[in-house]
From Swiss-Prot:
Span of zinc fingers (C3H1-type): 28-54, 108-135
Signal peptide (UniProt feature, chain positions): none
Region Disordered, annotated ranges: 1-30, 58-107
UniProtKB keywords: DNA-binding, Metal-binding, Repeat, WD repeat, Zinc, Zinc-finger
Repeat positions for WD: 148-189, 191-225, 227-264, 271-308, 311-348, 355-395, 397-435
Source organism phylogeny: Eukaryota, Viridiplantae, Streptophyta, Embryophyta, Tracheophyta
Matches recorded under InterPro entries: G-protein_beta_WD-40_rep (IPR020472), WD40/YVTN_repeat-like_dom_sf (IPR015943), WD40_repeat_CS (IPR019775), WD40_repeat_dom_sf (IPR036322), WD40_rpt (IPR001680), WDR86-like (IPR044715), Znf-CCCH_4 (IPR041367), Znf_CCCH (IPR000571)
Compositionally biased residues, Gly residues: 77-103
SUPFAM superfamilies, alphabetized: CCCH zinc finger, WD40 repeat-like
One Gene Ontology MF term: zinc ion binding
Protein known as: Zinc finger CCCH domain-containing protein 17
PROSITE patterns noted in UniProt: WD_REPEATS_1, WD_REPEATS_2, WD_REPEATS_REGION, ZF_C3H1
SMART domains assigned to the protein according to its UniProt record, in alphabetical order: WD40, ZnF_C3H1
Length: 435
């Protein structure tokens, strides 16, 4: 099988107060920067000194986004999109935009939509004073919700050459969705909780406890790969190998055999002390993120661990390759950007702080082909950031945590949350197109 892989792809609260509080002094006193704020320990409110190095940027307030029609189309049935957000940016450009810690203050955080609307029971309707919207961004619109799963969605895939979208859930089912009608076209009952799902070419891979299920969407061939112990939390493909991240901390590898038209065991990568929850392949390297708070770097040629990254202080939930950089997010409320040194080892070149634990990363170009990072947080939102500046592009809201994000063709992307609901989104060129 000739497989090519796109680069995919705690608990201290962080406060960002910009400028003096209302009622604070506005003369020479307010022209000074608070030394305690600089040290990260100012507890005065209001504080008479500046809590900012630069004047606050004017925040552009995005318009509402709601449900559009109930049909989306897959104009390129070959899938595409990948989980990596292409582009370039030197290490000195990280975080240099509005919202980035190095280049100026964050955008003003937008008001949240009506919580009763999100729960589906707002009695005020159009008279409600709070936005009835699943997003706060003028760059995206929600096309349709897809309902049917009864528990958290843990994987979404769009196989090449298929007109079906696939989703997996802890309810033990795989659902097939017709890309032309938005209707559920079939349900496969796996009988076990689904831990993850990916597609590569015509292949669909589904991680379940103690096994990986494999389907060829073109030939309808079905296989069952055994060897994992416990749940399979992540899958990745690279260098003609299939990798599965398991609950016991191992990463198992299989190689496709043209002779048997199947997958043969190739290796077991050992090193993590706790469950591995995310995998990504890029530049002949496999990157694995674990509950043991580390990221390991594996050489795809030798399948040996060549570096262990230990800068995170919480569970590392997701890793993503973007251009020549590695991005990681953690429950320690940070997104870290890693770059290679002259010796070839990775080190942190930028840390972006969040106010909540980060769960999942994905990347894609927007409607104007600018790279955007999508980061799911455990406050039931997804943050959108321009890369490499980390400028704020808005937020997506959900009833429960969004655990699955999948990029599609033509500006489409999909999210799956803890209630079992999927949503289909699309980037738009003009904010006036958002509904």
């Amino acid at each position: 099988m000739d497989i090519e892989t796109d680069g995919r792809f705690g608990n201290k609260r962080v406060h960002h107060r910009l400028g003096p509080a209302n009622g604070a002094a506005s003369s020479s006193t307010s022209g000074k920067v608070c030394i305690h704020w600089r040290a990260g320990r100012c507890n005065r409110f209001p504080c008479p000194y500046l809590h900012s190095e630069l004047p606050e940027a004017t925040a552009k307030r995005p318009s509402q986004s709601g449900g559009g029609g109930n049909v989306w189309r897959n104009p390129h049935s070959g899938g595409g999109g990948g989980r990596g957000a292409g582009g370039a940016g030197g290490p000195n450009k990280w975080g240099r935009g509005p919202g980035g810690a190095d280049g100026g203050p964050r955008h003003k955080v937008p008001d949240r939509p009506c919580r009763y609307f999100l729960a589906g029971d707002c009695s005020y309707g159009e008279k409600c004073r709070y936005p009835h919207s699943y997003s706060m961004s003028d760059s995206i619109t929600m096309l349709t919700p897809l309902q049917g799963h009864e528990k958290v969605v843990t994987g979404i895939a769009l196989p090449a050459g298929s007109d079906k979208l696939y989703s997996g859930s802890k309810d033990g089912t795989v659902r097939m969705w017709d890309c032309q009608t938005g209707q559920c076209a079939g349900v496969i009952n796996m009988g076990r909780e689904i831990g993850c799902m990916i597609s590569e070419g015509p292949w669909l891979f589904v991680g379940i406890p103690d096994a990986v299920k494999v389907w060829n969407m073109q030939t309808q061939a079905e296989m069952n790969l055994t060897g994992p112990t416990g749940q399979v939390y992540a899958l990745a493909v690279g260098n003609e190998l299939l990798f599965a991240a398991t609950q016991d901390g191992r990463i198992l590898a299989w190689r496709f055999s043209a002779a048997t038209n199947g997958f043969e065991p190739a290796a077991s990568l050992v090193g993590h002390q706790l469950a591995v929850v995310s995998l990504v392949v890029g530049a002949m390297r496999l990157y694995s993120a674990s509950m043991d708070k580390t990221i390991r770097v594996w050489d795809l040629a030798t399948l040996q661990c060549i570096q262990t990254l230990s800068d995170h202080t919480g569970v590392v939930m997701s890793v993503l390759c973007w251009d020549q950089f590695l991005l990681s997010c953690s429950l320690d409320q940070t997104i870290k950007v890693w770059a290679a040194t002259e010796s070839g080892s990775l080190e942190v070149t930028y840390t972006h702080k969040e106010e909540h634990g980060a769960l999942a990363l994905s990347g894609m170009p927007d409607a104007q082909s600018k790279p955007v990072l999508l980061c799911s947080l455990n406050d039931n939102t997804v943050r959108l950031y321009d890369l490499p500046s980390f400028s704020d592009r808005g937020r997506i809201f959900s009833k429960q945590e969004i655990r699955a994000i999948q990029v599609g063709p033509s500006g489409l992307f999909f999210t799956g949350d803890g209630t079992g609901e999927l949503k289909v989104w699309q980037w738009v060129i003009d904010g006036s197109q958002t509904k």
